[in-house]
Design a protein with these regions (language model features):
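Conserved C-terminal "switch" segment of AAA+ ATPases
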Residues: 49-54, 134-140, 146, 155-200, ...
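Pre-Walker A (pre-P-loop) alpha-helix and adjacent loop at the N terminus of AAA/AAA+ ATPase modules
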Residues: 1-23, 194
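Short glycine-rich substrate-engagement loop in P-loop NTPases that contacts/grips substrate
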Residues: 55-84
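C-terminal helical "lid" subdomain and adjoining coupling/linker elements of P-loop NTPases
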Residues: 11-14, 178, 193-248
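Conserved catalytic/switch belt of AAA+ P-loop NTPases
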Residues: 95-127, 133-136, 140-144
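Walker A/P-loop
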Residues: 17-55, 79-82, 149
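Flexible beta-alpha connector loops of hexameric P-loop NTPases
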Residues: 62-73, 96-107, 152-154
Length: 248
């Protein structure tokens, strides 16, 4: 997309017509695989390339778009879209907008979104996110969605080594370190978790939760020790990881 935008700019500089294309995307993948982070980066890139004036990201989901009573969903959806103008609107678990049957107000949100995407096509980029199979069914079920969203980007689950690297980054950022045995215990645990992972596996979120549990267990272990030196305060021991795993 970036190359196309740059080339369009060069065409304009040479007096050639610029071709307009839709930049809307569908992000597929499990939770915690970086979809929101990439959407935020994408918004910034679009601003730098001159596609968007603000380049901010507005995150929402079904709850942010659908109201409880008839006639209110369009109003609610329009308010969210207004805040996203000149930026990117990120709708997480977008497929839930069409899961409530024909009488569900989610269809009103979809209709409102499609109209605003057309009316504000120069000021709004929409990213729909969710599980792969659900998103494909969702997009294919609606001609309006199908005609506007043809760009799919899949976010695969992290490997055990990648999850361990993320875990270590969380530790390093807060000046914690793992003992050698704690490192082995963590690596073994993550390998097992990835092996049995299902669609609801949290990936980076899962690792973040493990990190928070580990430092909590360390605090519990050291709380009654008066003479804690700097190394003790930094080091996460194997028993901290074991107790964290037991609570996961």
């Amino acid at each position: 997309m970036a190359n196309f935008i740059k080339l369009n700019r060069k065409r304009t500089e040479q007096g050639l017509p610029a071709t307009q294309i839709a930049y809307h995307c569908v992000f597929t993948g499990n939770p915690g695989t970086g979809k929101t982070t990439v959407a935020r980066l994408l918004a910034g890139i679009f601003k730098e390339l001159g596609v968007l004036k603000k380049g901010h990201l507005v995150e929402t989901d079904r709850a942010g778009l659908v109201a409880e009573y008839i006639g209110q969903t369009a109003v609610k959806t329009n308010k969210i879209i207004d805040t996203a103008l000149d930026g990117v609107l990120f709708i997480d678990e977008a497929y839930t907008l069409a899961q409530g049957g024909n009488q569900d107000y989610g269809h009103e949100a979809i209709a409102t979104l499609l109209k605003r995407m057309e009316d504000n096509r120069d000021r709004l980029i929409v990213v729909l996110a969710g599980y792969g199979s659900e998103m494909k069914t969702f997009i294919e079920s609606n001609p309006g969605l199908r005609s506007r969203f043809s760009r799919y980007i899949n976010f695969p689950d992290y490997t055990p080594n990648e999850l361990l690297e993320i875990f270590l980054k969380y530790l390093s950022k807060q000046q914690y370190v793992l003992s050698e045995s704690a490192m082995a215990q963590t690596a073994n645990f993550l390998t097992k978790e990835v092996g049995k992972a299902k669609n609801d596996f949290g990936n980076a979120r899962f690792v973040r939760n493990l990190f928070e549990k580990a430092i909590t267990q360390q605090a519990n272990r050291l709380a009654n020790i008066e003479s804690c030196d700097k190394d003790m305060l930094k080091r996460i021991e194997e028993e901290d990881i074991i107790k964290s795993i037991q609570r996961t």
